[in-house]
Design a protein with these regions (language model features):
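Interfacial/capping segments of alpha-helical transmembrane domains
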Residues: 9-21, 152-164, 450, 460
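Non-cytosolic membrane-interface motifs at loop->transmembrane helix junctions
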Residues: 92-102
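Alpha-helical transmembrane segments of multi-pass inner-membrane proteins
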Residues: 1-7, 36-53, 66, 70-88, ...
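TM-adjacent membrane-interface loops and short helices in multi-pass inner/ER membrane proteins
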Residues: 151, 192, 323-325, 329-331, ...
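Juxtamembrane membrane-water interface segments that cap and precede transmembrane helices
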Residues: 14-33, 90-91, 172-189, 434, ...
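Long, low-complexity, polar/charged, intrinsically disordered or flexibly structured peripheral segments
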Residues: 350, 355-427, 442
């Protein structure tokens, strides 16, 4: 139910007061996250009451609670990070474009504990798997409609439901879709095409697993869910989803070979062939060029920009261009303004003018994509430096010194943020190299506790303008709201210690499960038995953790992971009446 919730919520943020944000950020609309946030919190409260009823009233066993200790440790670090946060309101309620405040992170913990306690049998796990397939099929209806050029959420019925009575006048002006794309990407009700891709890849992996395990009508159901999920996965255009899914399938094939399960290897090879054909056909029909998009994002060549530094000083602007330092200033003569450029030794550079475009440039920088312009606007003198389709605007009327005016028209400081690694490689993985290199230095003061849940945007050096400009105008004008890495997200916001607890959960459970499994194999004379649904759940957990390298935790997907993690930690061992190998 949770992934399907879409509801308009308009929030007053007061963020527009920050120098690096536009005034429009004071009031923001949300459709896909806040509603899910509220419903998840209500579900978590119901789960707590159910747990109390089962354990304290009915005296049911909760299982070995020692396996929940890392989970409790994670929850404690979340609470402590909120208590010590400088932005407590954000840490409690969450930030726009994320809405993962303390209450939601604790709700994830409750979801995992509930799954750990409640799931008792193979029948329970079959119910979870069947529910996931059904949800995947329903979600694919939205996705296939988008591929065919429609948008279910944009129909008048859904628009009126989404906005409600309070904002009904907005219903006729709403259109859902991705702007600036050459083709319609699938996102469904999952906020973003990347998260939609991850979701459909999880359903596809589960469908392949269940197709091998199930018989009869249930096998057909798994096949239908797999095919529909594959179509929507391809339509999402998510690069990380397909790459991580292929990595998991290779891992499964290697393990099947190790266990001498040739039949499972053939199933995986057949599934890989179908996936490959699906991408080839889709690319041919829609001209998407998936392979090209993947290789472009994996372009590992170093890239550098000639403009590497800007310092705004009292009486001039200092820039480093192609390794050389220059001083820029403007001279006022009556109603006219004249730019001047000086070399490091104090000599003035000759300027070449283009009267038609009213720009000029140093003669020694002819054809190097750097131009100067001075002008008055509303009586205020400005000097603009143009490079790489970006305008750097300066004035000298603020506090009687030179000041940078950012693209939002606000005076701001230009800083050079500390970085670790990725020098010349900031463009790697769709500019994630830059974000990661500026995020890692933030960790040194966040070992025990972090800055608070959902406060990454307030911690990131948003005014590291020069380094961002080197990645192009699109990235330069973007507000960095998340690190695009779940592990950095956790470490910054709730502390490195919380990341250790977070990783202890799947890694510790995985080691325990594999140790028990191979011990049983040895006892049975290396005869492979059906390991029920736990193998499939393990694959989904590994897949989700892999996608976390380049994606963040989001309320649209995270609850599903925590459900699976709780089940996996319980490591259910039902009676095995049927022997049927599963990869």
């Amino acid at each position: 139910m949770l992934p399907f919730i879409v509801k308009l919520h308009i929030r007053n943020t007061s963020l527009g007061d920050l120098s690096w944000l536009p005034e429009s950020m004071n009031r923001r609309a949300d459709f896909f996250l806040y509603g899910k946030n509220v419903v998840l919190f209500v579900i978590a409260v119901i789960m707590i009451l159910n747990i109390i009823d089962r354990i304290l009233i009915r005296n049911e066993k909760a299982g070995n609670v020692k396996y929940l200790l890392p989970l409790c440790g994670y929850g404690i670090t979340v609470i402590l990070s909120t208590i010590f946060s400088k932005s407590k309101d954000v840490a409690l309620r969450g930030m726009i474009e994320q809405y993962e405040g303390m209450w939601i992170l604790l709700a994830y913990v409750i979801v995992a504990i509930y799954s750990y306690i409640i799931v008792q049998s193979e029948k329970d796990m079959e119910c979870i798997c069947m529910t996931m397939l059904t949800a995947g099929i329903l979600q694919s209806v939205f996705g296939i409609a988008e591929i065919l050029g429609g948008e279910i959420l944009s129909t008048s019925l859904f628009r009126n439901i989404i906005v409600g009575q309070q904002y009904k006048e907005l219903a006729g002006h709403m259109v859902f879709g991705f702007m600036g794309e050459s083709y319609q990407r699938v996102s469904g009700t999952l906020y973003n095409s990347n998260y939609a891709g991850i979701y459909f890849a999880m359903i596809l992996l589960l469908g392949i697993f269940l197709f091998v395990k199930w018989d009869g009508k249930k096998r057909i159901y798994a096949a239908v869910a797999s095919v529909l999920s594959l179509i929507c996965l391809i339509g999402s255009g998510s690069k990380s989803a397909i790459l991580c899914m292929l990595a998991v399938m290779i891992w499964c094939a290697a393990e099947a070979l190790f266990r001498k399960q040739r039949k499972q290897v053939l199933y995986l090879l057949a599934a890989s062939a179908v996936i490959g054909c699906g991408y080839f056909i889709y690319d041919s029909v829609f001209g998407v060029h998936t392979i090209q998009r993947i290789t472009e994002s994996l372009d590992l060549q170093e890239k550098t920009d000639k403009l590497t530094d800007i310092r705004v000083l009292k009486d001039h602007i200092s820039i480093i261009w192609d390794g050389e330092t220059y001083a820029l200033c403007m001279e006022k003569e009556g109603k006219s303004l004249y730019p001047h450029v000086f070399a490091k030794d104090g000599s003035e550079l000759e300027l070449v003018s283009d009267e038609k475009r009213q720009i000029c440039w140093p003669e020694t920088m002819e054809g190097q994509d750097i131009y100067l312009q001075c002008y008055y606007k509303d009586g205020v003198p400005y000097m603009a430096v143009f490079h790489n389709d970006i305008r750097w605007l300066f004035t000298d009327v603020v506090d009687d010194r030179y000041t940078y005016i950012n693209i939002w028209g606000k005076p701001d400081e230009v800083i050079s943020a500390p970085s670790v690694g990725f020098k010349g490689k900031e463009h790697w993985f769709t500019d994630r190299g830059y974000i990661w290199s500026r995020t890692i230095p933030l960790l040194k003061n966040k070992i025990l506790v972090g800055s608070g849940p959902d406060t990454f945007m307030l911690q990131f050096p948003q005014n590291d303008y020069v380094a961002r400009a080197a990645q192009g105008y699109g990235f330069f004008s973007e507000i960095i709201t998340k690190p695009h890495c779940m592990y950095l997200q956790i470490a910054v916001q709730t502390g490195v210690l919380s990341l250790v607890f977070f990783l202890c959960l799947p890694i510790g459970s995985g080691i325990k499960y594999r140790r028990n499994r191979y011990r049983n194999l040895k006892k049975d004379g290396e005869k492979q038995k059906d390991h029920t649904y736990v193998d499939g759940i393990e694959c989904l957990i590994i897949f989700y953790l892999l996608t976390g390298i380049t994606n963040d935790s989001m309320v649209v997907l995270a609850p599903l992971y925590w459900v699976l993690l709780g089940v996996f930690m319980k490591n259910v061992k039902p009676a095995l009446d049927k022997v049927r190998p599963v990869f």
